[in-house]
């Protein structure tokens, strides 16, 4: 399997069963770059294809999560040119997790600003942790730009309609406390502790049966917005495969023997 290489704009680190992806342009508040997104796509592929990776964390360096598009760089070339020259392609969409969801849990560990594309990437994650001073917002409309990371479609599916419209149409920024109250994030921790909390969550997830975790995640996604009677058919099909696995035998056996289970992902 190909190794994911870290680069100046993004760092990739393996800790146990968890892959940590760090956006690494702190001088630009971790604004997105072509190189950063290339490495991120490689990392997503690694998470999906490496059976020993059970969880992934996305974070940012230097006390920033991600400021989205590099607006200063955009002054060198009209933003619309990327649609003409082909630079806005599938790899960029994949990096932003637009239309792509990982097969394993993805946790966001947010410190500082997660603005525009930063909040858009956030919506592609499953569990979200933020330092108490973190800021969120989808501010593209302020600069007569459009949220190409998918927020006009998926934000309203994640928080109440009127709150989604408020954020999208005013472009205002909100605090971590407000984001938690809206349901955009799940955990608020002291500043500097977001990654620590994310690692705790990743360890808890990785200790569970990987087949069960991935199946639950798949069922959540595949049945989203479906009528229950249709969703339960898919839910049952996915669940039966888990019950037929070797790990489904190991779990109850470990419980009966009062020991930690040794799951083999099969």
From Swiss-Prot:
<keyword id="KW-0456">Lyase</keyword>
<feature type="active site">
    <location>
        <position position="120"/>
    </location>
</feature>
<keyword id="KW-0153">Cholesterol metabolism</keyword>
<dbReference type="Pfam" id="PF00378">
    <property type="entry name" value="ECH_1"/>
</dbReference>
<protein>
    <recommendedName>
        <fullName>Enoyl-CoA hydratase EchA19</fullName>
        <ecNumber>4.2.1.-</ecNumber>
    </recommendedName>
</protein>
<dbReference type="GO" id="GO:0016829">
    <property type="term" value="F:lyase activity"/>
</dbReference>
<feature type="active site">
    <location>
        <position position="140"/>
    </location>
</feature>
<keyword id="KW-0442">Lipid degradation</keyword>
<keyword id="KW-0753">Steroid metabolism</keyword>
<feature type="modified residue" description="N6-succinyllysine">
    <location>
        <position position="135"/>
    </location>
</feature>
<dbReference type="InterPro" id="IPR001753">
    <property type="entry name" value="Enoyl-CoA_hydra/iso"/>
</dbReference>
<comment type="similarity">
    <text>Belongs to the enoyl-CoA hydratase/isomerase family.</text>
</comment>
<dbReference type="InterPro" id="IPR014748">
    <property type="entry name" value="Enoyl-CoA_hydra_C"/>
</dbReference>
<comment type="subunit">
    <text>Homotrimer; substrate probably binds in elongated tunnels between the subunits.</text>
</comment>
<keyword id="KW-1207">Sterol metabolism</keyword>
<feature type="modified residue" description="N6-succinyllysine">
    <location>
        <position position="142"/>
    </location>
</feature>
<keyword id="KW-0443">Lipid metabolism</keyword>
<dbReference type="InterPro" id="IPR029045">
    <property type="entry name" value="ClpP/crotonase-like_dom_sf"/>
</dbReference>
<comment type="pathway">
    <text>Steroid metabolism; cholesterol degradation.</text>
</comment>
<dbReference type="GO" id="GO:0006635">
    <property type="term" value="P:fatty acid beta-oxidation"/>
</dbReference>
<comment type="function">
    <text>Degradation of the cholesterol side chain involves 3 multistep beta-oxidation cycles, this may be involved in the second cycle. Hydrates 3-OCDO-CoA ((22E)-3-oxo-chol-4,22-dien-24-oyl-CoA) to make (22R)-HOCO-CoA (3-oxo-chol-4-ene-(22R)-hydroxy-24-oyl-CoA). Also acts on octenoyl-CoA. Not active on (E)-3-OCDS-CoA ((E)-3-oxocholest-4,24-dien-26-oyl-CoA) or 3-OPDC-CoA (3-oxo-4,17-pregnadiene-20-carboxyl-CoA). Hydrates the same substrate as ChsH3, but the 2 enzymes make different stereoisomers of the product.</text>
</comment>
<dbReference type="GO" id="GO:0006707">
    <property type="term" value="P:cholesterol catabolic process"/>
</dbReference>
């Amino acid at each position: 399997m190909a190794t994911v290489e870290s680069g100046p704009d993004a760092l990739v680190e393996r800790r146990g069963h968890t892959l940590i992806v760090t956006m690494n342009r702190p001088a630009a508040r971790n604004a997105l770059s072509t190189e950063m997104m290339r490495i991120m796509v490689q990392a997503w592929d690694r998470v999906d294809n490496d059976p020993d990776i059970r969880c992934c964390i996305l974070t940012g360096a230097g006390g920033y999560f991600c400021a989205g598009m590099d607006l200063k760089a955009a002054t060198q070339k009209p933003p619309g040119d990327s649609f003409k020259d082909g630079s806005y392609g599938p790899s960029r969409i994949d990096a932003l997790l637009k239309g792509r969801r990982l097969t394993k849990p993805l946790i966001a560990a947010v410190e500082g600003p997660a603005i525009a594309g930063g909040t858009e990437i956030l919506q592609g994650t499953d569990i979200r942790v933020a330092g108490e001073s973190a800021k969120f917002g989808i501010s593209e409309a302020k600069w007569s730009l459009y949220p190409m990371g998918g927020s006009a479609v998926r934000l309203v599916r994640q928080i109440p309609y009127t709150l989604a419209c408020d954020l999208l149409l005013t472009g205002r920024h909100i605090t971590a406390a407000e984001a938690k109250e809206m349901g955009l994030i799940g955990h608020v921790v002291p500043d500097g502790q977001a990654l620590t909390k994310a690692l705790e969550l990743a360890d808890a997830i990785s200790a569970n049966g990987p087949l069960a975790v991935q199946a639950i995640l798949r069922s959540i996604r595949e049945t989203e917005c479906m009528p229950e009677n249709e969703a339960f058919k898919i839910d049952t099909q996915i669940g039966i495969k888990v019950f037929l696995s070797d790990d489904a035998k190991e779990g109850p056996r470990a419980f009966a023997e009062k020991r930690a289970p040794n799951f083999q992902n099969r």
